[in-house]
Amino acid sequence: MESQKEARILQEPVARPPGASRSQTPNAKERQEGGPVPAAAALGAEADDDSADRLWELPVEPAKRRPECSRCSRPQKVCLCPFLPAHPLHISTHLYIIQHPAEENKVLRTVPLLAACLPQDKCKVKIGRRFSEERDPELSTVCRKSGTLILYPGAEAANLEEFILDSPVYPSTIIIIDGTWSQAKDIFYKNSLFRHPKQVQLKTSISSQYVIRMQPTNRCLSTLECAAVALSILEKNNYIQETLLRPLQALCSFQLQHGAQIRLSKEHLLKNGLYTKPMPKNKRKLRKMELLMNSVKI
């Protein structure tokens, strides 16, 4: 009986301690405890590393961009040339667009549409954040001319329509900054060249038709819309505004038909309790948000 009992004890499996592996071989223990790794495993790891290195060394093929229209800079399948004027608009005003570098490659930018509607010698785009007489003598000369205006809202800005009525020299050039509001502010205040032209702003009640991009307030306009309104005032021709807005309307309509959503202004979202992002902790930014909620001009 005792011998049978001993046999049963020997046949019963020994309970493994928690966390122990099924294999208690020395190699397994060493792997578990961070000890020496078997040669075969080490060779396999080195082979994997070599394969990964070879993959990194392979030449990277550049992403293929869709063919673009040479006139409107839109992909050929969604070309907006049918909505552009057959010939560039005849204007006497020179337009300078100061474009922030971040805007240059944005898909839904409006400056190429604006430039496609105007003569090349009347519309010039300068890309950058800092400008000086040494870097851009042409722009420096333009800024110092008495007939040059810069369109940027502010307490010191004159209303454009009122200014041209009283100005002894009729404006021949207008400068517009292209970028987000924070980018435009940075360009305007950190370039002393832009202190020379007369600062003007638009006094208009129209709402932006650029509904596929969020604006800070209901009164903010895109660069193309600002140029359309300003040129129609300076040229005393409302047809200019209608013509320049046509490709913008087509762009927004096409995007909305293909899944884009109407982007309401931040002011509208705040006033109607629809703003879902957390309020900023920075006091200066928080103050701006409060001004937007109270429809105070900032």
Swiss-Prot record:
From its record, what is one biological process in GO terms? tRNA modification
For molecular function, the Gene Ontology terms on record are: tRNA-uridine aminocarboxypropyltransferase activity
- Which gene holds the coding sequence for this protein? DTWD2
Residues that the record marks as modified (N-acetylmethionine) are: M1
Give the subcellular location: Nucleus; Cytoplasm
Coiled-coil residues are none
Provide the protein name.
Answer: tRNA-uridine aminocarboxypropyltransferase 2
Species the sequence originates in: Macaca fascicularis (Crab-eating macaque)
- Residues of the region (Disordered) are 1-52
> Which PANTHER family does the entry mention?
TRNA-URIDINE AMINOCARBOXYPROPYLTRANSFERASE 2
Motif range (DXTW): 178-181
Q: What is its EC number?
A: 2.5.1.25
Catalytic reaction(s) noted = a uridine in tRNA + S-adenosyl-L-methionine = a 3-[(3S)-3-amino-3-carboxypropyl]uridine in tRNA + S-methyl-5'-thioadenosine + H(+)
Q: Which residues carry this modification: Phosphoserine?
A: S132
Q: Which UniProt keywords apply?
A: Acetylation, Cytoplasm, Nucleus, Phosphoprotein, S-adenosyl-L-methionine, Transferase, tRNA processing
Q: Name one GO cellular component term.
A: nucleus
